[in-house]
Amino acid sequence: MRNWRWLLLVLAALLAWLQHRFWFGPGNSGEVRMLQVQIVQQHQENERLRQRNASLAAEVKNLKDGDAAIEERARSELGMIKPGEIFYRVVEDIPAPLPNDTSADHGVDLSQPRREKR
């Protein structure tokens, strides 16, 4: 009977040591959870970069194969035009405020009749 008590005591001590190592030792459960979160974040970043690489590869292929993409970039980014073309720039006017627009009257209440000073 006495041997069983010693065996139980040794097993309890072993269990306590294993639990301590599981919760507080190197590679503990908190660290494992943190690493799992980092893995998920890294997978998301990798997927984002794969999509970006595919987009850039398609753009490079388009620039190598097609003149339309080169022309579009030259027109939009560099402001280039073809020989013989006439460049027109359309500048839109700022719309005048409407009479009932209270945002432009600078605090003047238009709903009240105006009283003139004499």
UniProtKB/Swiss-Prot annotation:
All ranges on the Periplasmic side of the membrane: 25-118
Compartments reported by the entry: Cell inner membrane
Biological process according to GO: FtsZ-dependent cytokinesis
Family per similarity comment: Belongs to the FtsB family.
Subunit field text: Part of a complex composed of FtsB, FtsL and FtsQ.
Higher taxonomy: Bacteria, Pseudomonadati, Pseudomonadota, Gammaproteobacteria, Lysobacterales
Pfam families membership: DivIC
Recorded coiled-coil stretches: 30-66
Residue ranges, compositional bias (Basic and acidic residues): 103-118
Location of the region described as Disordered in the Swiss-Prot/TrEMBL record: 98-118
Matching HAMAP family: FtsB
Classification via InterPro entries: Cell_div_FtsB, FtsL/DivIC
NCBIfam families hit by this protein: PRK00888.1
Principal location: membrane
Cytoplasmic topological intervals: 1-6
Its membrane topology: Single-pass type II membrane protein
Protein name per UniProt: Cell division protein FtsB
Keywords assigned by UniProt, alphabetized: Cell cycle, Cell division, Cell inner membrane, Cell membrane, Coiled coil, Membrane, Transmembrane, Transmembrane helix
Cellular-component GO terms for this entry: cell division site; cell septum; plasma membrane
Regions that span the bilayer: 7-24
Taxonomic source organism: Xylella fastidiosa (strain M12)
Function: Essential cell division protein. May link together the upstream cell division proteins, which are predominantly cytoplasmic, with the downstream cell division proteins, which are predominantly periplasmic.
Keyword Lyase part of the UniProt annotation: no
